[in-house]
Every structure is written in structure tokens, then in C-alpha cells.
Amino acid sequence: MSMKQIETLVFDYGGVIVNIDDVSVVKAMESLGVTAFKRLIHVRKIKRLMHQYINGLVAESETLKEMLSLCRKGTTTEDIEKVLEELCGNLPVERLEALVKLRKRYKVYLLSNINDTLWQKSVSLMKQLGYSTDELFDEVFLSYAMRKEKPSVEIYEEMTQQTGLNPATTLYFDDRAENTEAG
């Protein structure tokens, strides 16, 4: 497919638009007493927590309470919130500038597995850099609001139905191969 045939661009947020430093996140978790051993032992619990958190299936307070149970005594929800801010990553202004330019030629959508708290922090960061989501994207699709997550087919179907985009003329940018394959 040539770029002349492309009409729509769909971007993931974490790992594509914003840089996420997994090492920093792990170090931040370890600072709260969530060691590699604990992560290994509680891998199912952590995956379930993150799935529920990212998809808005449980209240944030409930997620934080369960996360506290994995941390060393004396850890507060504020400590965990600081660690979660690490997930907001580093947002290069050049990428935001590129999105604005791309919107002049293509429909540009965001499709991301993210929770409300991290999204609000990300929106705030974009504003600090001088941009609004309306300037950057034609529409935003977030897992927590849709109660679906990539790579489930349902999230792509809903986005396609709402936007009328043609998957055959759409490029997907995601840091996970399974998400671009599903799209």
C-alpha cells in the first residue's frame, strides 16, 4: 500500500507518542518494596490489577488498596500514585508537533490502553507543552472509557463504527505487534 492510499493514522499513546522507561517504573516499584521476587510470585494478581485499572473496571481507590498489599509497610497511596506517574513517561514536544502536521493530510486517531488517572495526567502534560487533544487528534479512544482493551477485536470494531474509517486505508502505530495485527 502506498502512502497515497492512506487516509487514516491510528496511534497508540504509551511507547509510541510518549516514551515509557520500563527500567524507571521497575525501580520505582522496587523503592516501594515490590521486588522482582514479589512480582514473580504475584504475577497473576499484578496482571489482573493492571488489566482492571487500565480498563476502568474497578475504582482507582480499590486498585490502590490492592497495590498497597504488595508494598512494604508504611507505603501510602500517595507513594503509589508517584510511581504510577512514572508510567506517564517522557513526552517529546516534537511528536506533538508532528501530529499537528499529520492532521493536515490524514485523519488522526488515538487508541490506547490507559486508565483515567494516567490519561488526565497525560492531558495535563500536553497542555503544559502548549497542545490540546483536539489539536492533536480527530478523536480519542481510551480503553477505560470503552471498557475494552487492545488487542480485542471489539475495541477496533467500535472505533471503526464510530469513525467510519476504512481499515484497508489505515495505518496503525503501536509498540506491540499483537495490537497492530488485531487492528
How would you label these PLM feature ranges?
Residues 2-5, 104-105, 162-169:
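Glycine-rich phosphate-binding loop signature in dinucleotide/nucleotide-binding domains
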